[in-house]
Amino acid sequence: MGTLARVKILVIGSGGREHAIIRRLSSDAPAPDLHAAPGNPGIADLATCHEAVTTLDLDAQVELAEQIRPDLVIIGPEAPLVEGSADRLREAGFTVFGPSAAAAVLEGSKTWAKEIMAAASVPTAASVTVTEVEELEAGLDRVNPRGEVPYVVKADGLAAGKGVVVTTDREAALTHGRAVVLAGGSVVLEEFLDGPEVSLFCVSDGSRVVPLAPAQDFKRALDEDAGPNTGGMGAYSPLPWAPQDLSEQVVRTVAQPTIDEMAARGIPFVGILYCGLALTSHGLRVVEFNARFGDPETQVVLEQIGRAHV
């Protein structure tokens, strides 16, 4: 029986998410020849790190790929995806796990994601997008007319998980909205969704969807969630309290309709569709979409995948 060829994989990124991806890949047999750009000290124990190649230097990423000739490139962070890293690498002839820049707008613009969800009949929070400071007051009244629940104010574009304010203080909501608009951005104002939040990663080849294990992360800093939103303070999985059919529900009502809508528009989504969900008293609702593995959830989800599935 012949020996299996050793696969070479390049992972773009430098965080705990990328470390988790490489750690899981390193457990395969035979172990792949792993490379990271730029990587970090923990990753360096498992892979060759190319520290000079940053996550947003697309030219350097292509040059590195042409030098080491990976069989697969995995792009971790959202920013290079939105900037077109996957497109550049595919154009150079490499196999990439990660969506095109056009598909990554699903994360890059919350307003556009809402449009996709509406077209695909995906359940989500009612919302309004404002582009002028003068529109903020009326917008808040529209999504939260009584002011009896928290206000939800989100920067439309990428903000590393820190562009969202959920507060009962109307003035704080207005202050955040003004700051985003005055910086040249748009603001998405949403109705508040009650119930626990869940993250579910769905792997897609542009037409099919396969869910991974659900997880829950903790976004706010400080004890008792007293601080502002962060990129993620921690996470755990599995979720013993979650409905047994949660993953099936999400694929049927959220992920597959979204992937189908993207394909119908000529924008196939290949990679991880991160479904951020709220299990509300009125049923499952989408809080957000991301176009990549979440961090820190990746660190607890990938540990549950059997070797045969890596």
PLM region spans:
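Glycine-rich phosphate-binding loop signature in dinucleotide/nucleotide-binding domains
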Residues: E66-P70, V143-E148, A183
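Internal nucleotide-binding/catalytic subdomain
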Residues: G163-V300
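Conserved small/polar residues in nucleotide/adenosyl-binding loops
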Residues: V73, A308-V310
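A conserved helix-loop-beta module that forms one wall/lid of the active-site cleft
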Residues: P99-G163
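CheY-like receiver
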Residues: L64, G139-V143, H176
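General beta-strand structural signal in soluble alpha/beta enzymes
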Residues: V11, A36-A37, I74-I75, V96-P99, ...
